[in-house]
């Protein structure tokens, strides 16, 4: 049995145990049984590994990885981890099935190997650290000291921390009496430095500003303990074996070039990481600083020894160019390109193709990223054109399109099946599988239809051929092949039923008895259930038929099991498109009539079971909301807001499915504009109307993590709906109220900073809430919703303070604040509750009597006699300083009257509150003392499943992306681990480039294509110029020689995608036109002004930047034609600036910019090489030769380094210099290389 199979079995056991909520002893017993079966299978296979208890290591790796992938930690996982290390807590005597599986050092190594230094992982890291902390202390304080030279420890260290690109899939072996200084010993040196760097990641968390109270974290303390007891000894051991190898006469005992290069790279990385940690460390931590300085000295010695080895090998450099050229020719057929053709006519049922990383990332963009549909469609067009451009000349356009459709189907089916297979990580995560099912059945046919329509309208595209058949011919061929080869995965999509048995039966059918036995081993240990089935095949085929992309007769006659498929399609309930045909209407017209008249919940249910209509429904719903807004029909808007809110909060998938096809801002901006109306709250007699709308607006912002910078001012043509002074330029340039409110929604403003009018309103509301007169109509008229949103935290603060000071008692407080549970005020409840949760965490816990005494309230509250012994404010004498706030929290949240959307909106703050409470183990038991209604367990049960966001669903299910994109072959792919967790930023770009420069990633074709696709598809959704920033931050001189070819290949792939994007955007760019107008206006103004405005004028002309400025020139990208709902006519004119235009999501990077930036890097590197006159000049010259060889190889291989002129010629009207080939060869990198040579 292979290592991968063993890990899969352990992973399945863990997931099933969690799904069935097995107790710790039962889980441990099953794990012991599975480990014994795996060991027996390995003995039968003759498999042997030098690492003792390898199965225990696999179990530790599985559990640690799963914990680190969870945003919400299941307490059962903590019990499982404790049992794994220490055995069952309930065992008596010595029981073989209740003892530990592995040791604490093994779990610690897996934590260090898998942890990412991101704040989102901190809760999981802390949980693991708390479990292993005591065990580490016991290990290091044991009578027998821990030996870093232990063969098992070194073997596991190398397995986890050695760069897999330098390994040949061989498990290292170490003799028991480890004094040998052979070549196998030296292999552990780079892994030791990687171990130190991993510890530094944990230590850096102690100064992370994004973490609350980082100085209290356990993880940095664990890392310090490990560095003291293991790190120092390990580096001393490495120094010893390197010194021995240096003095050895046998060259075979010296490190080879690959290990030496990796060692020097890791030494440089380690020193950089240590310096970064030292800069952020508290100066008071003198012992820790001294430890890091000591490690710096040890690593410096290792680096010096490595450098001496490198200098001894410089004589071999002269032979490298010839050898490299031979290697390049040998690997030419395996070079990463955008060409990926699969002949669907010859594919067999057993030939399931691997999903290419760029296609997997494209699916991630389409489903998980909430940006405009035009942006997503552009990405589809770009990848197809890149595929077509790189295809063989003999390949017809028909076959390219069919293969591309087949590729999209396979990727969507595989991703959907991977998501369905994963048990939900938390309550509410089940919706993610439904979203993917809807995307597979509704989005893929829509994409194919729109791609075909785009090809119909753009005959001038560089496609090298024509389409001779109708679209249905191509998609039918792709569908036939996809249904054939993806049959098992489609079964998973329809029902995740008994996958272990199914896999075992398939393996047995194919004659793979051993594989079948391994697959069914899991089912022998633990049975599986049977969830309901979903008609995925029927939905997909019906959507294709209704989009005129497939024919019913072709499905019945030409598909495998065609008559059964056709019968399943016929058995579906009548589709909405059929309703439209029977009424003689187009589908969008049908929705235009039904959205205003049908009950929203019933129509949503009908649409949910008809995925082929989701795109039209989403677009029509946005148009309808805009129409209602023009008519000031807030009641209709409120009905749909309430229905969509309930759908999202009750586990439905329709809101998330709608957001696949529209940018959340398209729905948010019109609704947010309601808050800017001058008569808001005065034109409607129904309080629930505004409450439903405003709660839905807040939910949209929360669920889709909408940054306030994306909320723009929106106006309608109806003048009655205009905002206050909407004609004034100042108000047009001001941000909408919602944008400012979200930034300060939980702020309780002091009375002293409020205006006289607001202070009067606060006083009137306090009297209305707690007086006898109640809330009058005059008070409502004087308090628009925007004011209540802003003042609600202050009202809570004043009310709670009044109760604490004895002005009102607790019952009166409850009665007054219960108004916020009613429709009249519920929209203001989220901000007030977030303030309340923060206030509870901020308030020190102390007895109420001490608190009142310190506040000078002894006489007015404490000394007042009462018949029942309570205080004057209604609190018992054993209450605490937090009791009033906790009672209010229980009143408003732990009740059926609390709107479900409110719980969603406060979930993040509630999680922070619970974490703060549970972190203080001494204060937590005293929290509820003196409270009548507060119960933390009951509150947590109420909040279970609340707070689900689209990003949380995507991150929780991100394992599908890593496994699918990595081809299911390299589950430890560092690149895809980074890409699935990184958010595009300067820091993220630096991490990627650092890994590339050292050769840790980017060596194989999948990594190269995956990173290029991420830069061109995923990152631009947040940072439009990510690809250009990537090249800008590359320093060629810092790249390891062995990594240069991979970096050059990635840049070449990026250029290929950008050129394809330029080819598919044939129109001019409005953003570029606006930039040009600004530059001309600035130039005109500068002619009649003094030199005092010279800097401003220069800043407005980025196109005139000097070549040696790292900032790219202003591009002239084509504009993606908006063929759907546009804001052009509705968006209010705003004051534009060059900065805002450059940051626009519509701005695109051009191939000319990337090539010019790459040429700049070449010039700088060449100048640096010529200026070096020391011992490093030989190494730099070798790098330059390698760089030249890599670029020349790509140029000779037909890459588009100097061919970008043809695309720019068509899209930007750049005429060639001499025309044809000569012009191209003189304008690209080839000319630069010739000149510099």
UniProtKB/Swiss-Prot annotation:
Alphabetic keyword roster: Activator, Nucleus, Transcription, Transcription regulation
One GO CC annotation: mediator complex
Domain of life: Eukaryota
Database matches in InterPro entries: Mediator_Med5_fun
Annotated GO MF terms: transcription coregulator activity
Main location as per UniProt: nucleus
Stretches the record annotates as Disordered: 1109-1131, 1202-1226
Biological process, per Gene Ontology: regulation of transcription by RNA polymerase II
Keyword Transcription regulation assigned: yes
Annotated localization: Nucleus
Biased composition (Low complexity): 1119-1131
Family: Belongs to the Mediator complex subunit 5 family.
Role: Component of the Mediator complex, a coactivator involved in the regulated transcription of nearly all RNA polymerase II-dependent genes. Mediator functions as a bridge to convey information from gene-specific regulatory proteins to the basal RNA polymerase II transcription machinery. Mediator is recruited to promoters by direct interactions with regulatory proteins and serves as a scaffold for the assembly of a functional preinitiation complex with RNA polymerase II and the general transcription factors.
Subunit structure and binding partners: Component of the Mediator complex.
Identification of the protein by name: Mediator of RNA polymerase II transcription subunit 5
Organism: Mycosarcoma maydis
């Amino acid at each position: 049995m292979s290592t991968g199979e063993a890990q899969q079995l352990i992973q399945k056991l863990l997931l099933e145990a969690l799904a069935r909520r097995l107790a710790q002893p039962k889980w441990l017993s099953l794990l012991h049984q599975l480990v014994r079966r795996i060991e027996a299978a390995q003995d039968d296979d003759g498999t042997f590994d030098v690492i003792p208890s390898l199965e225990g290591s696999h179990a530790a790796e599985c559990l640690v990885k799963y914990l680190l992938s969870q945003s919400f930690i299941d307490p059962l996982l903590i019990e499982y981890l404790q049992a794994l290390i220490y055995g069952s807590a309930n065992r008596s005597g010595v029981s073989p099935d209740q003892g530990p599986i592995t040791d604490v050092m093994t779990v610690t190594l897996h934590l260090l190997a898998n942890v990412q230094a991101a704040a989102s992982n901190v809760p999981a890291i802390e949980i693991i650290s708390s479990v292993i902390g005591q065990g580490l202390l016991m290990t290091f304080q044991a009578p027998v000291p821990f030996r870093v030279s232990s063969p098992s420890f070194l073997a596991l260290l190398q397995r986890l921390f050695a760069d897999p690109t330098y390994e040949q899939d061989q498990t290292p072996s170490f003799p028991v009496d480890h004094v040998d200084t052979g070549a196998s010993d030296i292999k552990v040196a780079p892994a030791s430095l990687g171990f130190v760097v991993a510890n530094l990641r944990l230590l850096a968390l102690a100064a992370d500003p994004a973490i609350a109270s980082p100085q209290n974290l356990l993880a940095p303390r664990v890392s310090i303990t490990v560095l003291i007891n293991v790190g120092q000894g390990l580096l001393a051991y490495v120094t010893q074996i390197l010194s021995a190898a240096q003095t050895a006469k046998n060259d075979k005992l010296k490190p080879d070039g690959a290990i030496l290069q990796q060692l020097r790279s890791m030494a440089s990385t380690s020193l950089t990481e240590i310096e970064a940690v030292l800069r952020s460390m508290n100066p008071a931590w003198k012992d820790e600083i001294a430890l890091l300085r000591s490690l710096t000295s040890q690593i410096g010695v290792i680096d010096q020894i490595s450098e001496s080895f490198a200098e001894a090998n410089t004589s071999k450099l002269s032979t490298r160019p010839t050898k490299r050229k031979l290697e390049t020719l040998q690997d030419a057929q395996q070079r990463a390109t955008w060409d990926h053709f699969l002949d669907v006519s010859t594919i067999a049922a057993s030939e399931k193709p691997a999903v290419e990383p760029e296609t997997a990332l494209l699916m991630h963009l389409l489903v998980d990223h909430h940006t405009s549909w035009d942006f997503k469609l552009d990405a589809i067009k770009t990848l197809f054109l890149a595929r077509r451009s790189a295809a063989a000349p003999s390949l017809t356009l028909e076959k390219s399109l069919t293969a591309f459709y087949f590729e999209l189907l396979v990727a969507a089916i595989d991703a959907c099946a991977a998501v369905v297979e994963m048990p939900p990580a938390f309550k509410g995560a089940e919706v993610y599988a439904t979203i993917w099912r809807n995307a597979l059945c509704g989005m893929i046919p829509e994409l194919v239809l729109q791609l075909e329509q785009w090809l119909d309208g753009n005959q001038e595209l560089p496609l090298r051929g024509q389409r001779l058949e109708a679209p249905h011919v191509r998609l039918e061929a792709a569908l036939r092949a996809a249904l054939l080869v993806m049959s098992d995965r489609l079964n998973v999509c329809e029902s995740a039923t008994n996958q272990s048995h199914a896999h075992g039966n398939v393996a047995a059918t194919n004659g793979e008895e051993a594989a079948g036995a391994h697959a069914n081993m899991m089912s022998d240990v633990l049975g599986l259930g049977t969830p309901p089935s979903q008609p995925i095949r029927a939905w997909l085929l019906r959507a294709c038929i209704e989009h005129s992309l497939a024919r019913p007769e072709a499905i019945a006659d030409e598909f495998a099991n065609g008559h059964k498929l056709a019968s399943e399609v016929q058995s579906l309930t009548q589709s909405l498109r059929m309703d439209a045909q029977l009424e003689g209407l187009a589908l969008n017209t049908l929705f235009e009539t039904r959205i205003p008249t049908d009950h929203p919940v019933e129509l949503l249910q009908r649409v949910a079971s008809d995925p082929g209509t989701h795109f039209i429904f989403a677009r029509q719903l946005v148009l309808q909301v805009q129409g209602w807004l023009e008519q000031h029909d807030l009641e209709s808007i409120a009905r749909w807001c309430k229905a969509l809110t309930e759908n999202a909060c009750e586990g439905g998938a329709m809101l998330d499915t709608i957001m696949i096809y529209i940018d959340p801002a398209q729905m948010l901006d019109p609704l947010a504009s309601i808050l800017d109306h001058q008569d808001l709250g005065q034109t409607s007699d129904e309080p629930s109307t505004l409450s439903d709308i405003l709660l839905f607006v807040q939910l949209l912002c929360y669920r889709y993590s909408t940054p306030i910078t994306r909320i723009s001012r929106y106006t309608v043509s109806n003048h009655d709906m205009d905002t206050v002074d909407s004609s004034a330029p100042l108000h047009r340039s001001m941000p909408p109220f919602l944008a400012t409110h979200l930034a300060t929604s939980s702020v309780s403003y002091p009375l002293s900073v409020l205006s006289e009018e607001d202070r009067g309103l606060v006083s009137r509301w306090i009297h209305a809430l707690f007086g006898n007169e109640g809330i009058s109509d005059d008070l409502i008229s004087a308090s628009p919703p925007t004011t209540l949103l802003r003042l609600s935290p202050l009202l809570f603060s004043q009310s709670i303070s009044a109760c604490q000071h004895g002005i009102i008692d607790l019952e009166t407080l409850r009665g007054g604040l219960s108004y916020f549970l009613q429709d009249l005020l519920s929209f203001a409840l989220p901000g007030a509750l977030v303030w309340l949760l923060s206030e509870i965490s901020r308030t020190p816990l102390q007895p109420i009597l001490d608190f009142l005494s310190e506040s000078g309230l002894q006489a007015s509250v404490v000394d007042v006699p009462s018949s029942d012994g309570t205080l004057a404010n209604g609190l018992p004498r054993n209450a605490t300083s937090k009791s009033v706030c906790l009672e209010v929290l229980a009143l408003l949240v732990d009740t059926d009257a609390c709107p479900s959307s409110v719980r969603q909106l406060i979930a993040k703050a509630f999680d922070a509150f619970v974490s703060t409470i549970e972190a203080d183990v001494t204060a937590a038991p005293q929290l509820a003392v003196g409270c009548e209604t507060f119960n933390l367990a009951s509150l947590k049960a109420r909040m279970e499943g609340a707070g689900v966001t689209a990003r949380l669903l995507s991150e929780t299910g991100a394992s599908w992306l890593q496994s699918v994109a990595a081809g299911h072959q390299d589950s430890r792919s560092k690149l895809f681990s980074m890409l699935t967790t990184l958010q595009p930023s300067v820091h993220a770009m630096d991490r990627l480039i650092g890994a590339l420069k050292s050769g840790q990633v980017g060596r194989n074709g999948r990594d190269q294509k995956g990173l290029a696709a991420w830069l061109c598809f995923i990152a631009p959704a947040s940072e439009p110029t990510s690809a250009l920033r990537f090249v800008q931050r590359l320093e060629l001189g810092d790249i390891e020689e062995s990594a240069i070819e991979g970096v050059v290949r990635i840049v070449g792939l990026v250029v290929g995608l950008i050129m394809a994007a330029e080819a598919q955007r044939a129109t001019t760019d409005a953003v570029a036109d606006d930039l040009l107008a600004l530059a001309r206006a600035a130039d005109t103004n500068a002619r009649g002004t003094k030199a005092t405005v010279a800097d401003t004028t220069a800043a407005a002309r980025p196109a005139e930047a000097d070549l040696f400025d790292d900032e790219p020139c202003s591009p002239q990208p084509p504009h993606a034609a908006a063929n759907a709902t546009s804001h052009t006519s509705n968006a209010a004119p705003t004051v534009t600036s060059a900065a805002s235009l450059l940051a626009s999501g519509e701005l695109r990077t051009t191939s000319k910019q990337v090539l010019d930036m790459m040429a700049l890097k070449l010039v700088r590197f060449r100048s640096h090489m010529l200026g070096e006159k020391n011992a490093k000049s030989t190494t730099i010259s070798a790098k330059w030769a390698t760089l030249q060889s890599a670029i020349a190889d790509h140029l000779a291989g037909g890459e588009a380094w100097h061919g970008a002129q043809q695309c720019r010629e068509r899209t930007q009207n750049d005429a060639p210099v001499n025309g044809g080939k000569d012009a191209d060869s003189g304008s690209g990198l080839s000319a630069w290389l010739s000149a510099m040579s």
